[in-house]
Swiss-Prot record:
This is Chaperonin GroEL. One of its GO terms (cellular component) is cytoplasm. It catalyses: ATP + H2O + a folded polypeptide = ADP + phosphate + an unfolded polypeptide. Signal peptide: none annotated. The keyword RNA-binding does not apply. ATP binds at residues 29-32, 86-90, 413, 479-481, 495. Keywords: ATP-binding, Chaperone, Cytoplasm, Isomerase, Nucleotide-binding. It is found in: Cytoplasm.
Length: 538
């Protein structure tokens, strides 16, 4: 396949055209008065959105050289979205501002490598300042504010705050379609897994077809139970206490199942048998989770624990165990809190190391089940188009809120980046030559987001910036929705620090790469030959 090449200044101008195409489409959505973009779909109804990353992802340019620039900006948006769940538009606006000014300097003869060095030094200084400005979330109201801003809806903000309050920092919150037009939160307390009773004869509530036991013992094993003899000693010990027994095993069959059912029907021993969740290594890990949560042990051949030797101390305990046809819920496990914390920390470390998205999800789910529970936000809407858009907003807001809990919050509306510029003044005095130009690029770009927010709301950015900087208060800024100057924290206009930091770092990274680009190589499009020769004219 033949290639086309473009060099130096011409190459950079092509990249700039691609950057502008994406950035100009995305930046009109910034702020509370950002506009919408309608995106055509190859099938189904068009999508209406004001989410930066969704718009950027849809853009492909016909000019292959310009398209390279467009793809680089898309990378900024999606990278920021992956890390923080929000801030994609801010990242795009920052990247465009840095690239535009940087290209002017390179065209005037500045050294791109030194400019990049200056950009990197300035960025790390501003990131430190963002960390200093940030403050931890102190209340559910703060969480609701962050979520409301990201989702552009107070109702969604309250739902996310409610869900996060219930499941805690490490809990899992999932987003699913509702069967009605209402949007609400469902909460599952305790450890829940998708395995139910092995036989319906265990049912204690025939109306609901479920088994409910208060303060049961829990026997956990990774074996198949078919021979009843090794189980008799522990069954007798439990029967003497008069408390119920829940057995979680790889499988329960033959005489063991018959014995358990008969004892249940006679009232000698209230019991239920449940298959262990998961498969292979995941099953072993989940059984260990259940054991730690309930304060028991896993009776496994691998560690040489025989069923005959089990004592009541080896069994897990819980406040309530509820077993349905295909799910089991353990509420109020009696495991030691410090052991549970250790296990959660261990799973957290695994999440950080894994690269597989699926593995990450399953580990987060396991951590949530140990840490407190699972909340499901059921999303309802009148039409399919509205449902898709609403679901997307909730998922974004959820990521942004998690980021806020993780690294704290900063004043929103582009104020933090604008005020963080002051740390660059000593840097600009220290640096010389082209490195100084790089730092100057970052300094100037930091006002781009607030300028764009003001512009989208119909105000003059220069006047807004002047008035905001007239006061030294870090939280003093401009509410573009109401057109008023105010304390951003009090007004609830806040951003997660992680979002602001990621937006700046990703924008600076792409700007540096683009400015140091000298050659573009693309594939030469093939000329399509007609399927058949043209008919001769007579």
């Amino acid at each position: 396949m033949a290639k086309l090449l473009r060099y130096s200044e011409e190459a950079r101008r092509s990249l700039e055209a691609g950057v502008d195409a994406v950035a100009n489409a995305v930046k009109i959505t910034l702020g509370p008065k950002g506009r919408n973009v309608v995106i055509e779909k190859s099938w189904g109804s068009p999508t209406i959105t004001n989410d930066g990353v969704s718009i950027a992802k849809e853009i492909e340019l016909e000019d292959k050289f310009a398209n390279l620039g467009a793809q680089l900006v898309k990378e900024v948006a999606s990278k920021t979205n992956d890390v923080a769940g929000d801030g994609t538009t801010t990242a795009t606006v920052l990247a465009q501002a840095m690239i535009k000014e940087g290209l002017k300097m390179v065209a005037a003869g500045a050294n791109p490598i030194l400019i990049k060095k200056g950009i990197d030094k300035a960025t790390s200084k501003v990131v430190e300042e963002i960390k200093k400005i940030s403050k931890k979330l102190s209340s559910t109201e703060d969480i609701a504010h962050v979520a409301s801003i990201s989702a552009n809806s107070e109702e969604i903000g309250k739902l996310i705050a409610e869900a996060m309050e219930k499941v805690g920092e490490d809990g899992v919150i999932t987003v699913e379609d509702s069967k009605t037009i209402d949007t609400y939160v469902e909460f599952t307390e305790g450890m829940q897994f998708d395995r139910g009773y092995i036989s319906p004869y265990f049912v204690t509530d025939p109306e609901k077809m479920e088994v409910v036991y208060n303060e049961p013992f829990i026997l956990i094993t990774d074996r198949k139970l078919s021979n009843v003899k090794p189980l008799i000693p522990i069954l007798e010990k439990v029967a003497q206490t008069g408390r119920p027994l829940v057995i979680i095993a790889e499988d329960v069959e033959g005489e063991v199942l018959t014995t358990l059912v008969l004892n249940k029907l006679k009232g000698t021993l209230n019991t239920v048998a449940v298959k262990a969740p998961g498969f292979g290594d995941r099953r072993k890990a989940m059984l260990q989770d259940i054991a730690i949560l309930t304060g028991g042990i896993v009776a496994s051949e691998e560690v040489g624990i025989n069923l005959e030797d089990l004592t009541l101390q080896d069994l897990g305990r819980a406040d309530v165990v509820r077993v349905k046809k295909d799910e089991t819920i353990i509420v109020g496990g009696k495991g030691k809190p410090e052991e549970i914390k250790k296990r959660v920390a261990q799973i957290k470390a695994q999440i950080e190391q894994t690269t597989s998205e699926y593995e990450k999800e399953t580990l987060q789910e396991r951590m949530a089940k140990l840490a407190g529970g699972v909340a499901v936000i059921k999303v309802g809407a009148a039409t399919e188009t509205e449902l898709k858009e609403k679901k997307h907003r909730i998922e974004d807001a959820l990521s942004a809120t998690r980021a806020a809990v993780e690294e704290g919050i900063v004043p929103g509306g582009g104020i933090t980046l604008l005020r963080a510029r002051k740390v660059l003044e000593p840097v600009l005095n220290e640096l010389t030559g082209d490195e100084k130009l790089g730092a100057q690029i970052v300094y100037n770009a930091l006002e781009a987001p607030i300028r764009q927010i003001a512009l989208n709301a119909g105000y003059d950015g220069a006047i807004i910036i002047h008035n905001v900087l007239s006061k030294d208060d870090v939280a003093y800024g401009f509410d573009a929705l109401k057109g008023e100057y105010c304390n951003m924290y009090e007004r609830g206009i806040i951003d997660p620090a992680k979002v602001t930091r990621s937006a700046l770092q990703n924008a600076a990274s792409i700007a540096g790469m683009l400015l140091t680009t000298e050659v573009l190589v693309v594939e030469k499009p093939e000329e399509k030959k007609p399927a058949a020769p043209e008919m001769p004219e007579y």
